[in-house]
Amino acid sequence: MRNFRSSVLVVLSLIIVLNVARASAKSKVHIVYLGEKQHDDPKFVTESHHQMLSSLLGSKDDAHESMVYSYRHGFSGFAAKLTKSQAKKIADSPEVIHVIPDSYYELATTRIWDYLGPSADNSKNLVSDTNMGDQTIIGVIDTGVWPESESFNDYGVGPVPSHWKGGCEPGENFISTNCNRKLIGAKYFINGFLAENQFNATESPDYISARDFDGHGTHVASIAGGSFVPNVSYKGLGRGTLRGGAPRARIAMYKACWYINELDGVTCSFSDIMKAIDEAIHDGVDVLSISLGGRVPLNSETDLRDGIATGAFHAVAKGIVVVCAGGNAGPSSQTVVNTAPWILTVAATTLDRSFATPIILGNNQVILGQAMYIGPELGFTSLVYPEDPGNSIDTFSGVCESLNLNSNRTMAGKVVLCFTTARDFTVVSTAASIVKAAGGLGLIIARNPGYNLAPCSDDFPCVAIDNELGTDILFYIRYTGSPVVKIQPSRTLVGEPVGTKVATFSSRGPNSISPAILKPDIAAPGVSILAATSPNDTLNAGGFVMRSGTSMAAPVISGVIALLKSLHPDWSPAAFRSAIVTTAWRTDPFGEQIAAESSSLKVPDPFDYGGGLVNPEKAAEPGLILDMDSQDYVLYLCSAGYNDSSISRLVGKVTVCSNPKPSVLDINLPSITIPNLKDEVTLTRTVTNVGPVDSVYKVLVEPPLGIQVVVTPETLVFNSKTKSVSFTVIVSTTHKINTGFYFGSLTWTDSIHNVVIPVSVRTQILQNYYDEN
């Protein structure tokens, strides 16, 4: 493997590193974005890029040596090594929309599908009606794929879809025959990363190929479209038949993220991501699943610095649904990422499954904590909370992050109780390591509810509880002469009384770039999701692992979209989003209230979970959809202040924005968000009937607190001649002060279909005012 890697690195170095030897030492990779391509033939597009670069650098040889990528399929542009002055000069060219330096992005089951409804065991549901997503292609941009995983077996899978134009690119430990009828494509993109970084073959164990070292990409791909794998569990927990959302959909992996080392983790170059999107458009994917994202502050959706938004714009224009993770910076507000209106942005919820771990105190009180402990029962053992008894010169700390301040004898041979307010879930494993190194036998961590389970080693129990239960245990310790505790192995608990919650880590709205665009759009399970992984994953158990994040929630939606695409092949990306958002659950599948994890549990609002929890069966027959086409996106670009020439190049045709600028409130989204209501506003939506031809819908309005909402007309009539109808919404406020957001809804119903449009309104009497009071 190392010999192959060395030869690959030599070749890549000759192509990338030595190719830029003539460039200034101060040069770095810049992306030159030209918008919609002007030629259908990719060769002509690339030639035009070389001509432009030759004019800048003075020769064809210099242009060839500077070029890193030519984006030539879905859109036009290139990545090249340029100095600041060269970048500034080419940016002044009238053909160029943006020039920016390269940047980096970060990474953002057995129970899921039974929980959400489309079970493969039912002969009359979405999975069976769509032949499990057969003939749809899910493209995944991530860390690669482990092709030998059973999740990518092609048993019972038919021929490769005829619209597929991609292939399987050989590389380190990866040959073309690693692909099959399930995993039909695999490519890797590293040129952008190599142009700015030295790839240390000794330090980084990643593969210079589409093969996945980290396991993240394998996990994501198997959630979206993994094949059936029976009797899968994580070391005995969560046992069942594993499958993806669309078990017969095809997977195409585009590796643009690279594992550097344990300290630096995984990095994804913007130029590599752009090339991956460009290739995915060419190859013919139907859905593009991207579990990556930037950080706040965000760049405008019309700014090339948001590379995912830029690439996604062109993918959506070609009919590809782009699904992105909303980010893991919750529960703080205004943290959601991937906020462009043409992207389907996903929040994460829990499942109705937990891993209950009995803690039995010496007074026979039983407390059910959460853990992934699969070791033997720990019999009654001394229980301690490290604190100063009042007559000691030693240092004591019951804070989980500071357990190392305690002497070993404080914890040796005991189970330790500690408290933490930290949100970082690594606190669990770090505290457990400290206790174990000191000779401790177990750990009970009291913390705010809702944080990820971080499994400790198999033979070491570390159990999470909330602060209330932690205080109960602390009182037991303080008022008992010789406190003891017994810890039993974890067990899987499904259904009652486990409730569904928006995960604490899931990033929240409102949208910090364009507050009138509701984000996230939708929520899906993303906590402790069991799926395939790479054997190199340190938590790997038989080829499978549990991970948490909006990275896991996004491919759930991608799998649902693949099923819906099979059922409605002519729908636009906006139609799929509308169907998913307007039919979502506001309660869990069993009718219980969903909660949102924050500093405390609360009733969720659209900034927590968009339309709600995805309801795949209802999304298949939404009744009405709010559709959008390129003109709607042009409306948005104009409202965002993009100039006419830039929009024209972006969309590939002459475009002139109206004067005055259109209102962002009139974009035909399946939501209504008004961030700065002062005077009465009127907005318009258009709905299209995709249900029975002759249908009549009546409106039900639940206005936000202190907000008046008037809908005209109140009844919509559809027939063979009338497929689409517009309605107006007049919104006014009774508030006399600046308020926060209040929430309501607008529902069109024909007694069978309920088309729910979430409404979010903030009164701003004094505009652009920030108040800390």
Swiss-Prot record:
Enzyme class per UniProt: hydrolase
Residues covered by the Peptidase S8 domain: 112-620
Keyword Glycoprotein carried by entry: yes
GO biological process, one term: proteolysis
Domain Inhibitor I9 span(s) in chain numbering: 29-108
Pfam families given in the database record: fn3_6, Inhibitor_I9, PA, Peptidase_S8
Maturation propeptide residues: 24-108
PROSITE patterns cross-referenced by the UniProt entry: SUBTILASE, SUBTILASE_HIS, SUBTILASE_SER
Glycosylation site residues: N200, N231, N408, N536, N643
Residues annotated as domain PA: 382-474
Catalytic center residues: D142, H216, S551
Coiled-coil zones: none
Localization terms from the record: Secreted
Lineage: superkingdom: Eukaryota
PANTHER family per record: PROPROTEIN CONVERTASE SUBTILISIN/KEXIN (PTHR10795)
Similarity field: Belongs to the peptidase S8 family.
Record protein name field: Subtilisin-like protease SBT3.4
Organism from which the protein derives: Arabidopsis thaliana (Mouse-ear cress)
Lineage: Eukaryota, Viridiplantae, Streptophyta, Embryophyta, Tracheophyta
